[in-house]
Regions:
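Membrane-interface alpha helices of multi-pass inner-membrane proteins
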Residues: 21, 124-128, 162-178, 187, ...
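Juxtamembrane membrane-water interface segments that cap and precede transmembrane helices
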Residues: 66-78, 234-266
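Transmembrane-helix signature of polytopic, membrane-embedded enzymes
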Residues: 15, 103-126, 141
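Transmembrane-helix motifs of polytopic, lipid-linked glycan transferases
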Residues: 90-110
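C-terminal luminal/periplasmic domains and tails of membrane-associated envelope-modifying transferases
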Residues: 366-429, 434-657
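Specific aromatic-rich, kink-prone transmembrane helix
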Residues: 102, 124-127, 139-157, 188-196, ...
Length: 657
């Protein structure tokens, strides 16, 4: 470890790094896991007990299920109780700023060169920024930093206080995030195996087998003090395996990040672990050739091999390649002789400074420019605690205000938010834990295909009594519900449908009438179920279009319509029409889309929206007139759009007969 004096440029550079960390970490909440964690935390706070069943489920609330994040959930519930959702953003920012401050400090002492420590921390920001979400896994980098000196240095492991530090880390980690706390045991297990290899294979008298065994035993004991660890890991494993098999992006190999595009941050996440693996192996070959068996450190080999396997295994783990990289950087810095140290350190410092600046720029492009679309949009969005188009804010608010009851077949990303606001009046079919039985998985997967969703809604209602559905529009491909289903509420692309034979159907329709009457709909007591849905959708459209993000989108679209460039005008008209289509203002959307098609009759996407809008607004002949052009232009449509048009054509044909 090297202690360096603090200098003003260093303070300024670290301040920039931590300011960016604070900015990214305080972004509007977008983790789909957050709200079921929060709801479980509220249950723990109110009952004083950790839930042992999947009590939020509409299907199997008595099914055994233990979540291993109970302490994080309880703490976040306390934060929200006293400071609201804004408090979660602030707390997240403080935790991650502290994490990166500790990371820089640890690297500064390990490497002995400020600029190397700064560049290393900047790389960690790029690799870990995707985990800047309000969920327990955001803490893993902090625990990684706390264990970094322990894994890098034999001297640290030999200190008298180290077992106590390991015990504290193990207890805290296992109760905050039991699943990832296993990494501590795996790491210390690798150290113990390495020490045994040093004694048995390399015949080294200084092999600290007993010390390594003590640290591992302390870590295991600390983890087992969690009341949820073993059951939590068992239940998590039964839930995560089907997720992996179904292609959950978080659990795909790191290289699959390139599916999202060849942007700098994606390239680093996708190829960074492989680049570090190549650099580490090359460096080890060089060192062993130069020094022979004396250079072999089996402890380090096992640690780095394990971390590199995990880093390659899943996108979410890419940052774990930082451990082998830390060994490489530290060894390079330590190898320089006193005579060449000044020259080499100056050169390395200059390269590291340029690399750090580039990495910070990459992180800013990814988190702000790409994440929000522009600085102007970032400012607009940042004022809200919830990221736009992430949670069913409008429909959940309606369901709570109206007092609607019943089980919900829902978009899997919405389950947590719906549970937070509506449980126990409403249970959900699924949330992001995916605690599903084998019989539920096909319904869940196929209900997220808009073309198969109506059949899955019918199957879920028949099998599990889920009388409500909550999905992104269009719930039904042609915008008209199947027989038996009635629209309760729509706001933008959020839709709630009620089955007419549901256990709470009559009560929910009565609640909708009262809700509409309270908002000035004079004849709410006499409207038909379909007319009730239309009235509710009209209110929802006004509220949704008044939201900041929609106002910004419409303003940008109308600005494009004033352009001298025809293609830009067409794009602006299509964007405005699509936004009005989302809002459910089909007649108005049709008029806007028709104006764009006058300029470019070959705009297949606009014509697809126009056909759906005409059909939904009752103009079947107008919709039918679009089918020949759409058939000719179908190669320009997405598979889902082609499927919608095929179903629309069948509906039109059935109507003609």
């Amino acid at each position: 470890m090297t202690r360096l004096p603090v200098r003003a440029p260093e303070v300024a550079a670290v301040a920039v790094l931590l300011a960016l960390v604070a900015l990214y970490a305080a972004s509007p909440l977008f983790a789909v896991d957050l709200f079921w964690h929060l709801k479980l935390g509220e249950v723990i706070r109110d009952t004083g007990a950790i839930p042992r069943t999947d009590l939020l489920s509409a299907v199997h609330p008595d099914r055994p299920y233990v979540q291993f994040n109970w302490l994080w959930e309880w703490l976040v519930a306390l934060v929200v109780e006293h400071f609201g959702l804004r408090g979660v953003r602030v707390a997240q920012s403080l935790v991650l700023v502290g994490t990166f401050a500790l990371l820089y400090r640890a690297c500064r002492r390990a490497f002995g060169i400020r600029t190397l420590a700064f560049a290393f921390s900047a790389l960690a920001l790029v690799l870990f920024e995707d985990r800047f979400q309000a969920r327990p896994s955001a803490l893993v980098l902090g625990f990684f930093v706390l264990t970094l000196p322990l894994l890098l240095d034999v001297e640290t492991r030999a200190r008298r206080a180290t077992p106590w530090a390991v015990a504290a880390i193990a207890v805290a980690w296992s109760n905050l995030h039991g699943g990832e706390s296993v990494l501590l045991v795996l790491s210390l297990g690798a150290v113990l195996a390495g020490e045994i290899a040093h004694r048995v294979w390399l015949r080294r008298a200084d092999a600290a087998v007993g010390r390594a065994g003590l640290l591992l035993a302390v870590a295991v004991a600390g983890l087992l003090l969690s009341p949820t660890l073993l059951d939590g890991i068992r239940h998590w494993w039964t839930a995560v395996v089907p997720q992996i098999e179904s292609g959950n992006e978080e659990w795909l190999p790191s290289y699959t990040m390139l599916r999202n595009g060849w942007r700098p941050a994606f390239i680093l996440i996708a190829l960074g672990p492989t680049a570090v693996a190549i650099a580490y192996v090359a460096e080890q070959v060089r060192v062993v050739r130069a020094r022979g068996r004396d250079a072999i450190d089996v402890r380090e080999w096992l640690l780095c091999a394990g971390y590199l396997v995990l880093a390659h295994h899943a996108v979410r783990n890419a940052f774990l390649c930082l451990l082998p990289l830390a060994f490489v950087v530290r060894r390079r810095a330590q190898m320089w002789s006193a005579a060449e140290a000044a020259v080499r350190r100056r050169g390395a410092g200059q390269v590291a400074s340029v690399a750090a600046a580039l990495l910070l720029a990459i992180s800013f492009e990814d988190a702000v420019l790409h994440g929000y679309g522009s600085l102007e949009r970032a400012r607009t969005i940042f004022a809200s605690d919830l990221a736009p188009a992430t949670y069913p804010e409008f429909t959940a608010r309606f369901l709570r205000e109206a007092g609607v009851e019943g089980g919900i077949l829902n978009d899997g990303r919405w389950g947590g938010y719906l549970s937070w606001l509506l449980w126990p009046r409403c249970g959900t079919f699924v949330d992001s834990r995916h605690d599903l039985t084998p019989e539920m998985w096909p319904i869940f997967l196929r209900s997220h295909d808009p073309l198969q969703r109506p059949q899955m809604m019918a199957r879920a209602f028949a099998g599990y009594g889920t009388e409500l559905s909550a999905f992104r529009a269009p719930t039904f491909p042609t915008l008209r519900p199947d027989p038996g289903w009635h629209l309760l509420f729509k706001a933008g692309d959020e839709e709630i449908f009620q089955h007419e034979r549901g256990a709470h159907a009559a009560a929910n329709v009565a609640r909708l009438r009262r809700w509409l009457a309270a908002r000035g709909v004079a004849d709410a007591g006499t409207l038909s179920p379909d007319a009730l849905g239309e009235a509710a959708a009209g209110i929802g459209a006004r509220v949704w279009l008044a939201a900041p993000m929609q106002r910004l989108k419409l303003r940008d679209a109308r600005r494009e319509q004033a352009s001298a460039d025809a293609a830009t005008r067409v794009h602006g008209l299509r964007e405005e029409g699509a936004t009005l289509w989302q809002a459910g203002l089909y007649a108005e959307a049709a008029r806007v889309l028709a104006r764009g098609l006058v300029i470019d009759p070959e705009d297949a996407k606009a014509r697809h929206f126009l056909a759906l809008c005409l059909f939904a607004s009752g103009d079947a002949d107008g919709a039918r007139a679009q089918i020949p052009s759409l058939t000719r232009l179908q190669a320009r449509l997405t598979p889902v759009q082609r499927g919608r048009i095929a179903q629309l054509a069948r509906a039109l044909d059935a109507g003609a007969r």
